[in-house]
């Protein structure tokens, strides 16, 4: 093998090694610093209810598609209940069932959440919505509102902002006031906006989520309006009209249903809580590689037993030591026995 072949082979190996390093560091999030830690949040949902004399079913909407975040781990805590998880139009659902129960019951869902910006663009493009079925007066009011908002806007983003402004000022709007009752909630106003947007052939849906705070404690779910402009999903706060996905907002479920439902019981209460923690970045990277189906961990030293890892850590240092001795011999003038022996 001549020198040219050696240089080409060395360059190919160097490029492959650098590409693998960048992939692990940028895509899988492998830490470069051994003391590096990742910010995570423990989120918890607790369902409390009184069971009835018949079989009981409790359904909880749980996080599924969470732009900007990913689920590191999740677990369910219950006493004797059967558990199934499934995909639903509102996202993922967990359903507990028990033939017979007595006394007040409490069920828990817990998850570890970490920030993952690669999940923002995972959502799919929705079909055009079907026009809402309304009576003649309501249809005329809807068409009048859409025509007025369209005159005051230039694209989907400005159309949605102007529409939300009309809804929030419904008492002064002759069209929107026909659809809203006095004292309507923010979630009801956001859901009404999806009806108006469907009349304008614009896909929209209501997302519900929580703000991941630094301090531990209970949190309340807030609505967020999602609108598709033909290319991507846009996010709007139906209360403040601000556009964009808040950086610490975790989308929990979507749709016009509540976070939980109960069959065969009464007095259902749901509480949400969040707590911030720090976790070794290596554990998060391993979990991310597992979820992505990457085989990079199959060839990693971390897949070996601890004793074998210790041996390899010593072997890896031998070329470094040889390089140091060579520099000391050739540039400093330290006398050695042979090339690498001090």
Language-model region placement:
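Intrinsically disordered, low-complexity N-terminal segments that are enriched in acidic
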Residues: 3-119
């Amino acid at each position: 093998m001549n020198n040219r072949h050696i240089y080409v082979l060395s360059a190919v190996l160097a490029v492959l090694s650098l590409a693998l390093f960048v992939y692990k560091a940028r895509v899988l999030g492998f830490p470069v610093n051994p003391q590096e830690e990742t910010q995570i949040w423990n989120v918890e949902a607790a369902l409390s209810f009184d069971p009835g004399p018949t079989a009981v079913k409790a359904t909880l909407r749980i996080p599924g598609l969470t732009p900007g975040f990913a689920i590191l781990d999740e677990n369910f805590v219950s006493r004797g209940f059967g558990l199934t998880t499934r995909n639903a139009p509102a996202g993922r659902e967990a359903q507990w069932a028990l033939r017979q129960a007595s006394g007040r019951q409490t069920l828990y869902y817990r998850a570890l959440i970490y920030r993952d910006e690669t999940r923002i663009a995972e959502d799919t493009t929705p079909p055009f919505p079907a026009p809402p079925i309304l009576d003649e007066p309501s249809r005329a009011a809807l068409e009048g509102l859409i025509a007025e908002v369209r005159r005051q806007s230039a694209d989907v983003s400005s159309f949605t902002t102007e529409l939300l402004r009309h809804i929030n000022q419904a008492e002064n709007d002759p069209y929107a006031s026909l659809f809203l009752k006095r004292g309507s909630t923010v979630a009801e106003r956001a859901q009404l906006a999806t009806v108006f947007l469907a009349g304008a052939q614009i896909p929209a849906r209501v997302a519900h989520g929580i703000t991941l705070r630094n301090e531990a404690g209970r949190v309340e779910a807030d609505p967020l309006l999602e609108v598709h402009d033909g290319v991507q999903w846009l996010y709007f706060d139906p209360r403040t009209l601000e556009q964009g996905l808040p950086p610490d907002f975790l989308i929990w479920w979507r749709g016009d249903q509540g976070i939980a439902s109960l069959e065969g019981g009464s007095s259902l209460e749901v509480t949400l809580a969040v707590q911030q923690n720090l976790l070794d970045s290596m554990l998060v990277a391993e979990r991310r590689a597992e979820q992505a189906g990457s085989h990079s961990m199959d060839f990693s030293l971390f897949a070996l037993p601890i004793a074998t890892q210790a041996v390899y850590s010593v072997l890896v240092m031998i070329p470094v030591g040889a390089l140091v001795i060579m520099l000391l011999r050739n540039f400093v003038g330290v006398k050695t026995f042979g090339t690498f022996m001090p």
